[in-house]
C-alpha cells in the first residue's frame, strides 16, 4: 500500500478477559487435560497449536476408526487412543473436549461431552440450526460447564485490538461493515461491530449454493453490512473493514485470521473533500504469530488456535463458563444471522 507507514514494534494486545480484570495472564498455565474428538485436518491443526499452551496436555483422541485414532496419537504424542467417542468422554482423566467432527454431528457429540460433565470447545460452525445451538448452550449452563463456540478469529490480538477500539469509540458509531469470505466468518465481524443485541431489519441476498454471492444487511438507524461470499478455489481480497462516524478499521488479509490492522482517523475538517486527495492519517499495527509453533499446511495462520486455547485456560482458572471474546449470546446471534442468510440463498442449513 502506497505511503503506508512502518508498523510499530511488534507486541501483543491485552486479551479482553485480562483487560476486564476477569482473569490473570499467568493462568494460561492452568492445567487442563484435553480430549480430541476427531482426527481430520482441523484436529491436526488444532493440536499442533494447543499443545504449546503451557497448561495444556493432549491426553486422549477418538475416531470411528481405531487405525486413525492410533496414528493420530502416535503422530502427536497423545497418550490414549479410542475407537469410540463414548469411551473418550468416559475417561476420568480428561477435563475438556475439543469437538472437531463434521458440523452435522456437532450437537450430538457436544451434548455427549456436556452430559458427562466435560467442558467443550466445539469447532465452528457450532451447529446447523439456531434451535440446536440454543439447546447446546442451555445444556452447558445446566451442567455448569463451559461450551465455547470455536470462532477462533475473536482471539487474535489484531481482532482484540479492533474490538477494543470499537468499544471505546475510537471510530465513532459504526455505520458500515464490509467483508468477504463466507457467511460465518463475515457474519462474526458484523456481530462484533454491531453487538449481540443488534438485530437486522432487512437482509437482501444474491447467489446460489456452491457459487459466489453476497448479502446486504440493514440494521436500525441506517447502519449496514455488505458481505461478499466467494466460491473456492478463488483469489479474493479477504479484507474486513469496519467504518464509523469518526474513522475506519481494516483487518488486513486474511481477515478471518489477521495478524495486522490499520486504523484511519480523518481530520475533523471538511478540507479533505475540497479538491484534494490527501489520504487519512493511518496507524498500522502488526501482531506476528507465535514463531515457536510449527504447523502443517495448507491453511493460513493456524497457529492462532493458540490464542483461543490460552483464553479458555485463563477463563476456566477464574471459574468462568464463557469467554468474553465470544460468549453464549453472541454465539446464538451469529447462528441466527448465518442461518437467515443461508435460508434466503436457498442453501442447505448445514454450515460448510
Summary of predicted features, one role per range:
Residues 1-28, 96, 220, 307-352:
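C-terminal helix-rich "cap/oligomerization" subdomain common to oxidoreductases
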Residues 2-76, 347:
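N-terminal Rossmann-like dinucleotide-binding module
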Residues 60, 80, 95-96, 176, ...:
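Short, Asp-centered acidic motifs that coordinate Mg2+ and/or phosphate
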Residues 67, 76-139:
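Beta-loop-alpha module in the N-terminal Rossmann-like domain of NAD(P)-dependent dehydrogenases
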Residues 82, 122, 147-149, 178, ...:
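Hydrophobic residues in well-ordered beta-strands that form the structural core
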Residues 127-189:
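A contiguous active-site-proximal alpha/beta segment in oxidoreductase catalytic domains
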Residues 186-243, 254-255, 332:
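Rossmann-like dinucleotide-binding domain that binds NAD(P)(H)
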Residues 223-310, 320-329:
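NAD(P)-dinucleotide binding in Rossmann-like oxidoreductases
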Amino acid at each position: 500500500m502506497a505511503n503506508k507507514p512502518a508498523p510499530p514494534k511488534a507486541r501483543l494486545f491485552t486479551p479482553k478477559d485480562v483487560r476486564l480484570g476477569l482473569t490473570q495472564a499467568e493462568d494460561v498455565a492452568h492445567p487442563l487435560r484435553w480430549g480430541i474428538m476427531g482426527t481430520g485436518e482441523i484436529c491436526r491443526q488444532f493440536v499442533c497449536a494447543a499443545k504449546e499452551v503451557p497448561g495444556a496436555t493432549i491426553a486422549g483422541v477418538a475416531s470411528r476408526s481405531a487405525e486413525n485414532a492410533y496414528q493420530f496419537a502416535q503422530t502427536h504424542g497423545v497418550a490414549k487412543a479410542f475407537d469410540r467417542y463414548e469411551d473418550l468422554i468416559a475417561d476420568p482423566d480428561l477435563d475438556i473436549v475439543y469437538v472437531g467432527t463434521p458440523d452435522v454431528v456437532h450437537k450430538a457429540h457436544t451434548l455427549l461431552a456436556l452430559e458427562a460433565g466435560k467442558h467443550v470447545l466445539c469447532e465452528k460452525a457450532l451447529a446447523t440450526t439456531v434451535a440446536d445451538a440454543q439447546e447446546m448452550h442451555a445444556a452447558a449452563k445446566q451442567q455448569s460447564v463451559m461450551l465455547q463456540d470455536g470462532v477462533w478469529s475473536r482471539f487474535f490480538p489484531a481482532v482484540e485490538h479492533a474490538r477494543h477500539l470499537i468499544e471505546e469509540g475510537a471510530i465513532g458509531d459504526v455505520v458500515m461493515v464490509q467483508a468477504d469470505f463466507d457467511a460465518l466468518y463475515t457474519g462474526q465481524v458484523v456481530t462484533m461491530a454491531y453487538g449481540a443485541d443488534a438485530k437486522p431489519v432487512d437482509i437482501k441476498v444474491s447467489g446460489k449454493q456452491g457459487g459466489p454471492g453476497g448479502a446486504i444487511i440493514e440494521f436500525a438507524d441506517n447502519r449496514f453490512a455488505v458481505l461478499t461470499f466467494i466460491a473456492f478455489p478463488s483469489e479474493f481480497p479477504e479484507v474486513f473493514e469496519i467504518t464509523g462516524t469518526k474513522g475506519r478499521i481494516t483487518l488486513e488479509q486474511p481477515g478471518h485470521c489477521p495478524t495486522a490492522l490499520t486504523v484511519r482517523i480523518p481530520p475533523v475538517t471538511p478540507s479533505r473533500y475540497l479538491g484534494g486527495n490527501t489520504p487519512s492519517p493511518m496507524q498500522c499495527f502488526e501482531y506476528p504469530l507465535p514463531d515457536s509453533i510449527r504447523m502443517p499446511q495448507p491453511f493460513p495462520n493456524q497457529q492462532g488456535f493458540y490464542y483461543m486455547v490460552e483464553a479458555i485456560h485463563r477463563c476456566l482458572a477464574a471459574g468462568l463458563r464463557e469467554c468474553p471474546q465470544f460468549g453464549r449470546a453472541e454465539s446464538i446471534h451469529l447462528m441466527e444471522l448465518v442461518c437467515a442468510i443461508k435460508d434466503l440463498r436457498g442453501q442447505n442449513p448445514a454450515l460448510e
